[in-house]
Amino acid sequence: ITGNQAITTKKLKRVMKKTNEKGKLLNLFRTKKFVEENFEADKQLIIDKYNELGYRDAMIVKDSIKSYDDRTVDIFMEIEEGQKYYLRNVTWVGNTLYPSEQLNFLLRMKKGDVYNQKLLEERTSTDEDAIGNLYYNNGYLFYSLDPVEVNIVGDSIDLEMRIYEGRQATINKVSI
């Protein structure tokens, strides 16, 4: 692996779940056969790891697989990390039910934080106290949130959180 500076080669190898080095104790319970689809999934895991650390432009620019012998392959990857990005401003558009301050509190991402796309996804939709759950738990089943990068200056990103609240759903009939 070349081109990586923000994450060590050792850590990148650990990120890969299905593609692994021969002769490591860690590989005892992992697959032994090289599978191209698993390698593609592992490459995406590497990019996801970079995205978590603020490297939203990270990409694997080259990769090659070369047969070493009958039983093993050598894998070469070149990574282009790009620059690290930070959150500058978060603005909310379309929210009428809850004030921006309350939504910012639930988002728990503030100016100067590393731009972590995984954390953004978790805090808007998958966490137990995610913003989506605030709406869903109050009957806004048609709610949607679209985080849009509206301005990128240097290493800073302005996010516009576009909310469509929709109508509140009500229960019409209950049959038991």
Predicted regions span which residues?
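Interaction-mediating elements
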Residues: I1-I176
